Amino acid sequence: MAGAYIVVRIKGQADVPHWAETTLKLLRLEKKHRATIIQSKENTRGMLDKVKHYVAWQEIDAGLAMELLTKRGRGPGYKKLTEKDLEGTDYPGIKELADALATGKASMSKIDRIKPWFALAPPRHGFKRSTKKMYGQKGVLGANRELSELVRSMI
């Protein structure tokens, strides 16, 4: 079983039902093209299943977590994340934090000095698949095996 998932909100804020909006807010995905890393638990899996028509997710590896933290991680004042921002936490550096996030031992919402989400840009050269369909129907939504390449093009 996976230690953690990378979750990216693909669809925007218009015409989203209240129940889905609430779930997306709990996942810290309030805007389009935001990503977060969540631990793989039974309740988070249920939340992902509930909003599968608005987000895409995949198991995350330490390399992608490291890339997200160094390039898109934000600390206090929305400044780039540095080693100094992690002082006073259980993680001496960004690499250790990335490993802990990828294995599910750490949670982004529990670390006070970093933003619990990553603001991504739209993918370079566009989406290769439909943003209106599930992954099994030639789309990008839901459990997506190719999400890591998509996220790398959005960083």
From Swiss-Prot:
SUPFAM superfamilies: Ribosomal protein L30p/L7e. GO terms for biological process: maturation of LSU-rRNA from tricistronic rRNA transcript (SSU-rRNA, 5.8S rRNA, LSU-rRNA); translation. The keyword NAD does not apply. One of its GO terms (cellular component) is cytosolic large ribosomal subunit. CDD domains: Ribosomal_L7_archeal_euk. InterPro entries: Ribo_uL30_ferredoxin-like_sf (IPR036919), Ribosomal_uL30 (IPR039699), Ribosomal_uL30_arc (IPR005997), Ribosomal_uL30_euk_arc (IPR035808), Ribosomal_uL30_ferredoxin-like (IPR016082). Keywords: Ribonucleoprotein, Ribosomal protein. The keyword Ribonucleoprotein applies. GO terms for molecular function: RNA binding; structural constituent of ribosome. HAMAP family: Ribosomal_uL30_A (MF_01371_A). Belongs to the universal ribosomal protein uL30 family. Part of the 50S ribosomal subunit. This is Large ribosomal subunit protein uL30. It comes from Cenarchaeum symbiosum (strain A). The gene is rpl30.
